A protein has these predicted regions:
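Catalytic or ion-coupling anion/metal-binding cores of large enzyme and transporter domains
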Residues: 1-17
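Feature captures the catalytic cores and cofactor-binding loops of soluble hydro-lyases/lyases
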Residues: 7-9, 19-128
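Phosphate/diphosphate-binding glycine-rich loops and adjacent basic-rich segments that engage nucleotide
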Residues: 129-135
Length: 135
């Protein structure tokens, strides 16, 4: 299995795929102290996103979501990588600000929802340039 994402922020990562089945807002939907999904209406409520390759077919939310991403990076509990169905400037901004503050940089890729659906439930490896493969 090999796929090519569109690079929004380049980097390398490895982590278990976590495909969110519904959109979520990081502001109010993700606990920045634990990385767990806290929105009680979300079907994956309670799941931790730390260290995962987080696939988000669609986003919902607030411009404050970038601050939550920044907190996750600062605490070392951010996802290993982000895969957006469509480019998302808000969460990407959190990663960019984190980079400027010296926090670890995670890769951020755009990968169509139809392509995300084809990803196997396994540990994925993201290479520089956006190559996605099973680890």
């Amino acid at each position: 299995m090999a796929m090519q994402g569109t690079v929004l922020i380049d980097g390398v990562a490895e982590g278990k795929l976590l495909r969110l089945v519904e959109p979520i807002s990081f502001w109010g939907g993700v606990d920045p102290a634990t990385s767990r999904l806290t929105d009680p209406r979300h079907p994956q409520h309670g799941v931790a996103i730390a260290g995962t390759v987080l696939a988000l077919a669609a986003m919902r939310g607030s411009s404050s979501s970038s601050a939550i991403m920044l907190e996750l990076l600062a605490r070392g509990i951010a996802p290993a990588a982000l895969l957006f169905g469509e480019p998302d400037a808000i969460l990407s901004l959190g990663v960019i600000v984190g980079r400027e503050m010296g926090y670890p940089v995670i890769p951020v890729l755009a990968l169509a929802a139809s392509e995300q659906a084809r990803l196997p439930d396994c540990v994925l490896r993201i290479a520089r340039g956006g190559a996605i493969s099973a680890a």
